[in-house]
Amino acid sequence: MKHYDFFPSGALTLNGRIGKALAKNIRCRLETLNYALMVDPFRFRSEDDGAWRCEFWGKNVRAAILAWHLMPSDTLLQKIKTTVKDMLSTQTPDGCISSYPADKQISGWDVWGRKYVLLTLLRYYRLIEADPAILQACCRLVDHLIGQLTGEKADLRTCGMHDGLASCSIVGGIIELYELTGEKRFLDFARSLIESGCSLKENVFDAALNGVAPKDIGNAKAYELSSCFEGASIFYRITNELRYKEAVEKYFRAIVKNEIFVTGTAGGKDDCGEYWFDGVKNQVSADPGCGLGETCVTVTYMRFCEAVAALNEYDQSPFDEMENSLYNALLGAMNPSGDRWTHANPTPLTGGGWKASPPDQIKRWFNTPFDEHDCCRAQGPEGLAFGAAHAVLKLRDGVMINFYEDFLLHDTTASGEKYSVEVSEDYPASGKIELFFNSTRPLMRKIVLRIPAWAENCELSLNGENIAVHAGKYCILERIWSDGDSVKIDFKPKVKVIRPADTEDVFALKYGPIVLAASGKNDVVPKPDNIFEPFADGCGKIVNFKQGEIVLCDYASAGAKFSPDDPLRVFFEEKRIFDNE
């Protein structure tokens, strides 16, 4: 069990940048999708070309369920219920739910697609309707898969893509199913996958424990590999087998150290930016020879951060990482209309890179159009909803606040006492927040506040009395709260110079959690040691700064035209400062 959970649907209202982006994505994307079309490959078992149409239903509907949980809408709820019923109608008497014809099943991306169906049905069961028919369908789906693993295909690592990583990443869903049913056969199946190491190349968990660099684990496919480690985190929480906790934590530390860009995404090596490749060092290259930062990797990294956070009650570093990804790479990947997402992110980050909406992925690779679907266009909404859902979390005896989005929370204690918590002040732009507690009578509650690692000079007061806090540590206020109690936090952000490890003469700039970018074709380089002045008239929707004639805005807003005529720059070369003087 995790030490936190989501609040009931509708209890939390997000009013800031994240909430507004989520509302737009619901309205402009999730409520407009043709869900029936995404079910068709399963109904007709027509995916005979080895493609991955099978992932789009699960990815999109899973995101829609969590988005609905945060922002209830009759329109979206009806679409979700209709399409879930539609998907269940494709399950044959043997339990199979697959988009692949019988003779091609458990090859290609088939099990990967089944994974997303399983995860979506489980989320539906947890967040919308605990219908026994849903759980029964999940059991039959997994039992059918287990029954197919015989003879030459007895080892799931031999079935599918990336040396087994894609197929074996279903392990997290298998363990979730065990949690809900208590059926030992599902735990046994999950154990067999975990103990196989999930890759034909090697046991990826042993590799992490032995300190192997992420780029050398398995085939280094960041999305699939990290999904297997997410499954290992869930496995540890069920079995308490310490080696898997240690493997997950070592892998997390290794990718933070070696792979995560300043913007909170990662990935390179191919055109789409899909592989671990010493990203910290290579993100500053003017010619990386690949795309940088697949949005699917951003979202998977955010999910993996949460899987790490679930291992330790008060280790906030995974949420520090998630905040960076959420406010920069993830928000920056959604186009202003709210219906499209970048695949690879701007390449290079040293200037000239621009945000681009990807084409129909199935048409591109298989010459058969599929409603302009793309894996990252399907995954982006999950990242947005997932990040929003972890801004404020329910504790057994209180509230955990990770991201200081303006919000209003209405909660009820176990004994039926109602209270509310409200946060305002337009974080992160203002660098400050004010929290108000309201209740009809005094209540014992715990309010846990994340103090970001970058906020070294943070000041916090409770009802006007200063309380010592430490950057990178949660502040735990466990007390009897009265109506009108208030907390003020001044994070005291300033523009900081970021010089990635193992790089020379290159720097980026951050204001609190926000990466600053130069939008447009201006090649003038700011002086890192000079003062940056905030101003109101720039293109940034979160922050704008200038230094003389040099204008910078938040990375999420930069390059908003999604056009080669609107490039952006994140990294600046120090030697060019002198060239410009």
Where are the regions a protein language model picked out?
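Low-complexity, Ser/Thr/Pro/Gly-enriched N-terminal "stalk/linker" regions
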Residues: M1-F56, D74-S98, P132, R191
